[in-house]
Amino acid sequence: MAMVASPDDIVKSPLPPPPPPPPPPLPPAHKDKAAYNPYSGCPAHGGDDGLDGIVLVLRAAAALLALVAMALVASCRHGDWMEFTRYQEYRYLLGVAVVASLYSALQAARTFRRMRAGTAYAATFLDFAGDQAVGYLLITASSAALPITIRMRSAVVNTFTDVVAASISFAFLAFAALAFSALIAGFRLSSSSSSAYNY
């Protein structure tokens, strides 16, 4: 005769624990690509990549050097043939030095304001082209004034020729500062374009 187990004899096994809830979905990777515009600058990715200070120093140095070159040329008013206004090369050098000083000072102030605001510098085509254009003016002005200065100094060396030679040297140094600034702007512009369009 079969034995039927009573309910009390049945050992109730515990229920298995419920499965853990699924982890929350990961947020999508953040990419600053939509706002990129090469003519107005790419969006800042936050922080300073170490080049902002170099750009500021280069542009401030270019402004100061061009200002010194301008002051030196303008001071060459010694009468007779020692008047810078008698030579179109020196008038051109003076005009270019004024333009370079104003441009570099405005760009330095713009960079400094961005650094104070905590905004990462975004290179633009205008920065790149502006540095190249003003640098080209400086090197052409220096090259135009150099031959006539060499001819003068081969005949006579005085305060006029010394000051003009110093002005040419400062203009060339201002060109070098803007040339390095243009290199940095081109590098950062290329890097920003690559990161913005590299999916």
Curated annotation (Swiss-Prot):
<dbReference type="Pfam" id="PF04535">
    <property type="entry name" value="CASP_dom"/>
</dbReference>
<comment type="subunit">
    <text>Homodimer and heterodimers.</text>
</comment>
<feature type="topological domain" description="Cytoplasmic">
    <location>
        <begin position="185"/>
        <end position="199"/>
    </location>
</feature>
<feature type="transmembrane region" description="Helical">
    <location>
        <begin position="128"/>
        <end position="148"/>
    </location>
</feature>
<feature type="topological domain" description="Cytoplasmic">
    <location>
        <begin position="1"/>
        <end position="53"/>
    </location>
</feature>
<dbReference type="InterPro" id="IPR006702">
    <property type="entry name" value="CASP_dom"/>
</dbReference>
<feature type="transmembrane region" description="Helical">
    <location>
        <begin position="164"/>
        <end position="184"/>
    </location>
</feature>
<feature type="transmembrane region" description="Helical">
    <location>
        <begin position="54"/>
        <end position="74"/>
    </location>
</feature>
<comment type="similarity">
    <text>Belongs to the Casparian strip membrane proteins (CASP) family.</text>
</comment>
<feature type="topological domain" description="Cytoplasmic">
    <location>
        <begin position="113"/>
        <end position="127"/>
    </location>
</feature>
<feature type="topological domain" description="Extracellular">
    <location>
        <begin position="75"/>
        <end position="91"/>
    </location>
</feature>
<dbReference type="GO" id="GO:0005886">
    <property type="term" value="C:plasma membrane"/>
</dbReference>
<feature type="compositionally biased region" description="Pro residues">
    <location>
        <begin position="14"/>
        <end position="28"/>
    </location>
</feature>
<protein>
    <recommendedName>
        <fullName>CASP-like protein 4B1</fullName>
    </recommendedName>
</protein>
<feature type="region of interest" description="Disordered">
    <location>
        <begin position="1"/>
        <end position="32"/>
    </location>
</feature>
<feature type="transmembrane region" description="Helical">
    <location>
        <begin position="92"/>
        <end position="112"/>
    </location>
</feature>
<keyword id="KW-0472">Membrane</keyword>
<keyword id="KW-1003">Cell membrane</keyword>
<feature type="topological domain" description="Extracellular">
    <location>
        <begin position="149"/>
        <end position="163"/>
    </location>
</feature>
<keyword id="KW-0812">Transmembrane</keyword>
<keyword id="KW-1133">Transmembrane helix</keyword>
